Amino acid sequence: MRIVVNLKPEEIPKHWYNVLADLPFKLDPPLDPETKQPISPEKLSVIFPMSLIEQEVSEERFIEIPEPVLKEYAVYRPTPLIRATFLEEYLQTPARIYYKYEGVSPTGSHKPNTAIAQAYYNKIEGVKRLVTETGAGQWGSALSYAGAKFGLEVKVFMVKVSYQQKPMRKYMMNLFGGKVTPSPSEETNFGRKILSEDPDNPGSLGIAISEALEVAVSDPNTKYSLGSVLNHVLLHQTVIGLEIKKQLELIGEKPDILLGCHGGGSNFGGTILPFVPDKLSGRDIRFVACEPAACPSLTKGNYDYDFGDTAGLTPLLKMYTLGKDFIPPKIHAGGLRYHGSAPIIARLVKEGLVEAQAFDQDETFEAAKIFAKLEGIIPAPESAHAIAGAIREAKKAKEEGKERVIVFTLSGHGLLDLTAYV
């Protein structure tokens, strides 16, 4: 019988967990690209509301989740932790495999966890419109939904190759009131520059971020919203890992391995960060970031300061990067086609606290198809990387005869990504 671990509605975490309070080292600060000195909050306030800037630099261990955000979380949280018994039987592994399913959210992924929070903080500071980028459309859909909830206009630049591959995402964003433009576009100076140099450019998250930032800085009523990478985004996503902790405690399990797909780091960070203090205190637990071999920022990138976008408009961030001009191949996992990585995750990799593994598209989709047939959930192409990672680890446990507890986050469903499976 399938084991599903559900928490009660009142058990939704009331605070986000801030790992910066517990790390034995300080992160390198974001730098002003003009002065190469730590960037001032005043400069960041052009694109972000001050409350999110404060969260970005906070070292407070727990940050209270505002009541209006909790009210919206309660629409779909807590999310279930499910034991993958059919997958275990198929693999004939002694490992116990659990997955945290974030696809039950209104837009089908983990992205509303931060979209709702960001929309709320922008709303209370008087912002009228949010502008953002999106790869596969999961983030754009989540922000469009959150904008509708809090009465904000939302403008989305969607990476062109994903815009063409995933038309249903555009329809979902439109349904929630979001206005979507394929990127690179004719709507911004940077977009026009890219198209003049390469009319067939497939786009990238770096380019789409540049276009969104250009719009944000030109309108005082508009702020920029980012779906991954930054500290405050990972902070909001820790509701995932905090719930996993409670759910595992309910059934008397302790994880040996935690996995998540990795593009910018929000889903992976949200999964593992609440467990980092356990590892720092000596517990034997592995964190595995699963990224596409076609965009291997953690496994093949350089650890250095780089821009978060292609035009060089963002602060310089210390991270693993393939270079701001890197244009990834047209893989189906559009949400993972990012040249950089979250500074928090990058530093954890650098310190040896997090492992990174790369997966090619064939292995990833083979894992996704097996999972769909056995567990009854069609995973998003991005999320399928975590499944591939879990299968690798389960096979290794079988070879070694170890009863390991493997936990991964299934960050979203793939019902709007079905063309990827053809």
From Swiss-Prot:
GO molecular function: L-serine hydro-lyase (adding indole, L-tryptophan-forming) activity; pyridoxal phosphate binding; tryptophan synthase activity
Protein EC: 4.2.1.20
EC top class, as a word: lyase
Alphabetized UniProt keyword annotations: Amino-acid biosynthesis, Aromatic amino acid biosynthesis, Lyase, Pyridoxal phosphate, Tryptophan biosynthesis
CDD domains registered for this protein in UniProt: Trp-synth_B
Reaction catalyzed: (1S,2R)-1-C-(indol-3-yl)glycerol 3-phosphate + L-serine = D-glyceraldehyde 3-phosphate + L-tryptophan + H2O
Recorded metabolic or biological pathway in which this protein acts: Amino-acid biosynthesis; L-tryptophan biosynthesis; L-tryptophan from chorismate: step 5/5
One of the GO BP terms on file: L-tryptophan biosynthetic process
Modified residues (N6-(pyridoxal phosphate)lysine): K111
SUPFAM superfamilies on file: Tryptophan synthase beta subunit-like PLP-dependent enzymes (SSF53686)
InterPro entries to which the protein is assigned, alphabetical: Trp_synth_b-like, Trp_synth_b_CS, Trp_synth_beta, Trp_synth_beta/beta-like, TrpB-like_PALP, TrpB-like_PALP_sf
Highest taxon of source: Bacteria
CC cofactor: pyridoxal 5'-phosphate
Parts forming coiled coils: none
Sequence similarity: Belongs to the TrpB family.
Record's subunit section: Tetramer of two alpha and two beta chains.
Function of the molecule: The beta subunit is responsible for the synthesis of L-tryptophan from indole and L-serine.
Official protein name in the record: Tryptophan synthase beta chain 2
Organism: Thermotoga maritima (strain ATCC 43589 / DSM 3109 / JCM 10099 / NBRC 100826 / MSB8)
High-level lineage: Bacteria, Thermotogati, Thermotogota, Thermotogae, Thermotogales
